[in-house]
Amino acid sequence: MQRRPLVAGNWKMHGSRESVGQLLRALKHGCERLETAELAVFPPFVFLQQCEEALMRTQISWGAQDVSEFERGAYTGEVSAAMLRDFHCRYVIVGHSERRQRHGETNEQVAAKVRAALRCGIRPIICVGETEKQRNANQTLSVIKEQLAVVLQMNDNLASLEGMVVAYEPIWAIGTGKNATPSQAEEVHAALRDQLHRQDATLAESTRLLYGGSVKPDNAAALFEMPNIDGALVGGASLEAEQFLKIGQQCNQSF
């Protein structure tokens, strides 16, 4: 099964109305050269409408950086999947390491957010990854498999999981300038693919696996050569249109 590669740009808590407008204009101008790879941007919540209005007639998708596990109610500061659907979000990032570490999100909460997104027809990008301490203790595979296992257990309707994306983001490589080598990343991606295959062969073949960890134009091409890497979750480089588009072009050429 041919999986369409995806390059997702997580803007985190960056941007202003003006800078977002400039970035969107540059991305719209440059994305026409991409024939195979899909680009998606993930702005802060307050810029979702701006992205929707700018990108609705382009080939660029958009989504949110988080979603509530709850449908509605007295949850101050939360944003529901139904609200994201109102802005035609195609994707939502769940379980990012910054949410897990700084906000104490558990595997069970991440799985509940996945379920909430799927119920509203939004494709979750499920982040998994290990700390440097866990890597040094040779716990990488056990950690990421447990993170994904909880999602699969709490969302056991396999048909509903079609369209989900899994992003491996080694925590020790995020915002540090470090990055996993292509072979290190491929080892984890192959393990994730095998775990999915044990659950369901069709699910394993259709699920896109992204690498996220200081992805830049100078290391992206080598990552995309790996058989189980279907794209990237890009942080800082996604805030610069030229860099983000170059990563997209490298992804486009590799598939």
Swiss-Prot record:
Annotated GO MF terms: triose-phosphate isomerase activity
Residues reported in the UniProt entry to bind substrate: N10, W11, K12, G175, S214, G235, G236
UniProt xrefs under Pfam families: TIM
Gene Ontology, cellular component aspect: cytosol
Subcellular location: Cytoplasm
InterPro entries, alphabetized: Aldolase_TIM (IPR013785), TIM_sf (IPR035990), TrioseP_Isoase_bac/euk (IPR022896), Triosephosphate_isomerase (IPR000652), Triosephosphate_isomerase_AS (IPR020861)
Main location: cytoplasm
Substrates-to-products reaction catalysed: D-glyceraldehyde 3-phosphate = dihydroxyacetone phosphate
Alphabetized UniProt keyword annotations: Cytoplasm, Gluconeogenesis, Glycolysis, Isomerase
This enzyme's EC code(s): 5.3.1.1
Pathway(s) it belongs to: Carbohydrate biosynthesis; gluconeogenesis; Carbohydrate degradation; glycolysis; D-glyceraldehyde 3-phosphate from glycerone phosphate: step 1/1
CDD domains: TIM
Active site per database record: H96, E169
GO BP: gluconeogenesis; glyceraldehyde-3-phosphate biosynthetic process; glycerol catabolic process; glycolytic process
Binding partners and assembly: Homodimer.
Family assignment from sequence similarity: Belongs to the triosephosphate isomerase family.
Function: Involved in the gluconeogenesis. Catalyzes stereospecifically the conversion of dihydroxyacetone phosphate (DHAP) to D-glyceraldehyde-3-phosphate (G3P).
Protein name as annotated: Triosephosphate isomerase
